[in-house]
Every structure is written in structure tokens, then in C-alpha cells.
């Protein structure tokens, strides 16, 4: 029933937003650095590099952090770190934006593994169905968000597009509050 799937729709929303942001950074960070912060050519790939590097390194520690703090707290903390990262990206300063992309990688690194962990521990529906819902939302976000960002940026500018990503990360914080209230998901 829909009542049993509802927590996984929340997880799917988080997955959509976070994987969407990942896709947007992969596709748009270099152009953002080039056009908005006016970064020199040798730094335009730095946003994606630092994002990927921090994401990779932090994923090695995610399980330890999860055991210590719990999945929902890790998701909220990751969204908070990514939100701070977007604030730095939106500063318009090349070096602050580079640090911001690094913080995006650090923050987002733990969110998707935790979302998948929660879905896989479902006690209300088959965990494979829960994972399918969450992964489907996430990959849809990864594919659609860069396109939407392109349309928004074409009409309003890259800064507005990245502001939208920042706002969406704030939405993740709100969704974790509602996720915490659900009894069907172990944190």
C-alpha cells in the first residue's frame, strides 16, 4: 500500500536531489567556474576534481560515521555540509567556489550510501522494492537535474541555477526531519 511506500518516497526525494546535484556538478562546475567566477583556464576543472576527490575519500569513512551517529543524522549532516559548500560556490570567488565544490563532495559522499542502507533495511516492504524506488528516483535526478539546470541557466544565469541546487539541499534537511518521524525506517 502507499502508506508503506511513503517513507521510501521521502528517501527517493532525497536520492533525487542529491544525485541530481552530483550530476549537475559533474556537468556544470567547470562552466560555472569559467563564466561566473572567471577562473583561469587551469582551474576550471578543479571544481569537479575536488568534488570527486573529497567524495571518494569520505566514502571510506562513511560506514564508521554511520555506526557512530546513525543514518538519518549522517544524511542531515551531509546535506548541511553540502549546503555550506553551495554557499561558498555562490560567493562568486574562484577559490571559495573550489572549496565549496570540495565540501559538496564531502557532504554528498555519505548521503546516497545511507539512503540505500535505510531502504535495504525495510521492515514494511520487500527491501529490493524499496531499493528500486530509491535508486529510480536517484538516477532520474542524476539525469534530469543537469538538463533542468541548463534550461534555468540559459534563461536566468548559472548563478540562479546553482542557487536552485542550494535550495534543493535545504529541502533534504527538511525531508530528513520527516524521515526521522517515520517508524518504518530504522536510523
PLM ranges: what are they?
Residues 6-49:
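Extracytoplasmic gate region of multi-pass secondary transporters
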Residues 33-34, 65-66, 120, 148-157:
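Interfacial helix-cap and linker-helix signal at transmembrane-aqueous boundaries
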Residues 46-55, 137-138:
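Transmembrane alpha-helical segments of major facilitator superfamily
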Residues 73-87:
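Structural signature of the two symmetry-related core transmembrane helices
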Residues 85, 95-103:
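Paired small-residue
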Residues 110-123:
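Intracellular juxtamembrane helix-capping segments at the cytosolic ends
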Residues 125-158, 165:
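A late C-terminal transmembrane helix in Major Facilitator Superfamily
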Residues 166-187:
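Multi-pass alpha-helical transporter architecture, strongest
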Amino acid at each position: 500500500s502507499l502508506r508503506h511506500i511513503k517513507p521510501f518516497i521521502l528517501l527517493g526525494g532525497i536520492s533525487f536531489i542529491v544525485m541530481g546535484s552530483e550530476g549537475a556538478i559533474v556537468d556544470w562546475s567547470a562552466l560555472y567556474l569559467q563564466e561566473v567566477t572567471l577562473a583561469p583556464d587551469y582551474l576550471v576543472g578543479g571544481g569537479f576534481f575536488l568534488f570527486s576527490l573529497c567524495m571518494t575519500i569520505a566514502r571510506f569513512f562513511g560506514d564508521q560515521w554511520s555506526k557512530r551517529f546513525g543514518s538519518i543524522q549522517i544524511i542531515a549532516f551531509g546535506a548541511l555540509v553540502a549546503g555550506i559548500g553551495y554557499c561558498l560556490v555562490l560567493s562568486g570567488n574562484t577559490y571559495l567556489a573550489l572549496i565549496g565544490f570540495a565540501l559538496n563532495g564531502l557532504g554528498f559522499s555519505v548521503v546516497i550510501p545511507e539512503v540505500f542502507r535505510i531502504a535495504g533495511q525495510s521492515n514494511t516492504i520487500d527491501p529490493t522494492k524499496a531499493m528500486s524506488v530509491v535508486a529510480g528516483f536517484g538516477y532520474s535526478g542524476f539525469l534530469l537535474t543537469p538538463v533542468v539546470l541548463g534550461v534555468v541557466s540559459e534563461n536566468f544565469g548559472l548563478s540562479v541555477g546553482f542557487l536552485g541546487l542550494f535550495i534543493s539541499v535545504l529541502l533534504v534537511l527538511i525531508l530528513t526531519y520527516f524521515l526521522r518521524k517515520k517508524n518504518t525506517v530504522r536510523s
